[in-house]
Amino acid sequence: MKLDSIDITHCQLVKSTRTARIYRSDTYAIKCLALDFDIPPHNAKFEVSILNKLGNKCKHILPLLESKATDNNDLLLLFPFEEMNLYEFMQMHYKRDRRKKNPYYDLLNPSIPIVADPPVQKYTNQLDVNRYSLSFFRQMVEGIAFLHENKIIHRDIKPQNIMLTNNTSTVSPKLYIIDFGISYDMANNSQTSAEPMDSKVTDISTGIYKAPEVLFGVKCYDGGVDVWSLLIIISQWFQRETSRMGHVPAMIDDGSDDMNSDGSDFRLICSIFEKLGIPSIQKWEEVAQHGSVDAFVGMFGADGDGKYVLDQEKDVQISIVERNMPRLDEIADVKVKQKFINCILGMVSFSPNERWSCQRILQELEKP
């Protein structure tokens, strides 16, 4: 075994979290998990079970090469090493806006008030959406579709859990989904016994990538939570700018883009409703039947605000999408842009029963 020949104490520590340490050894990544320190819903044994089940069958899932338990009750997982994740890739395409303000013009123009505060620095999104967006979208959908076909919900789809091939000079890098630490295998009796399918934990996903049904306590969710997370990633490609270096904005926010703030679910809920409208509780049956219906009605009323995106006429729906993802206008191919809009409108439903599956998205992408 390769792991038998690796001394982890001599490996480079790449990342450390509450539940895992990631090391690099040449062309390999080693994930070290403490078997006696699982923090639910993290579970090292279920993670290995899922990775072994997936094997090397999907080109968009980073394969597990080996696993090994140590005498210290740690579990070592060996993967191919990839240098960059999707969030870092998006970060590197935000460039500082170097347009300078002319102070003499302001002094000579009495109609412009003189202000003491310096202008807010802007960073412009220069990701080539014509080169990357469709390829990235298709690759991620194919990877998530494979998971769902195998009865697995990832539960933490985010750019940090999407790795890219080191060779970013190609037309479009190859993407790999990683980190199955909180994933859920609906076909694993041990996992469904510990966490019943109609009573799954809702402490899943990260920040802005949480699906709205989970935010309102629906425990019988399905793979639709992964589709929603993917929708938010898509929205990040099509934002124009940010005022904070290193921040990659999306169409919604949870307050974590503010300095010294970790964000909150309540602010995320308000942001989702501000951008996409509030449905009536009658049209959101999952929350009405299985979620925190009293909290929803108490805070937002039972009748909605009349602005829910999917209650609007089609042309209004499209304008809402384009307003929330302004760089869609930069896609040169009209058919590609229309495919994105159709898929986004299919993915944006608050009701997971109406939200498009990955297979439905792929059908749309395959259209001529």
From Swiss-Prot:
GO molecular function (one): ATP binding
Organism of derivation: Saccharomyces cerevisiae (strain ATCC 204508 / S288c) (Baker's yeast)
UniProt EC number: 2.7.11.22
Domain (Protein kinase): residue spans on this chain: 1-368
Enzymatic reactions: L-seryl-[protein] + ATP = O-phospho-L-seryl-[protein] + ADP + H(+); L-threonyl-[protein] + ATP = O-phospho-L-threonyl-[protein] + ADP + H(+)
GO biological process per UniProt: G2/M transition of mitotic cell cycle; meiotic cell cycle; negative regulation of transcription initiation by RNA polymerase II; regulation of cell cycle
Coiled-coil region(s): none
List of catalytic residues: D156 (proton acceptor)
PROSITE patterns per UniProt: PROTEIN_KINASE_DOM (PS50011), PROTEIN_KINASE_ST (PS00108)
GO cellular component: cytoplasm; nucleus
Name listed for the protein in its UniProt record: Serine/threonine-protein kinase CAK1
Keyword annotations of the record: ATP-binding, Kinase, Nucleotide-binding, Serine/threonine-protein kinase, Transferase
Annotated family: Belongs to the protein kinase superfamily. CMGC Ser/Thr protein kinase family. CDC2/CDKX subfamily.
Signal sequence bounds: none
